[in-house]
Amino acid sequence: MSNSKIGFNFKKLRAQKGYSLERVARLADLSLNTVVRLESGVNKNPTIETLTKIANALEVSVDDLLK
């Protein structure tokens, strides 16, 4: 799975919810830096824990982030 694809899906799903990066970070209990790096594709190896936290914050499945 391409990191840019994860970032693209993350950005799309976040926009659909109308959430800011700050809100996702807060809901996911992650640092803003982690969230920004994931969405921009800079984070080359997001852990399943990070992906799960993001998915839960967006109320979607991890599969939705990976599609």
For the regions a language model picked out, list residue spans one by one.
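A short, Lys/Arg-rich alpha-helix, primarily the initiator
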Residues: 1-16
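Residues within the helices of the helix-turn-helix
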Residues: 11, 22, 52
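The alpha-helix within a helix-turn-helix
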Residues: 14, 25, 55
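DNA major-groove recognition helix of helix-turn-helix/homeodomain DNA-binding modules
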Residues: 49-64
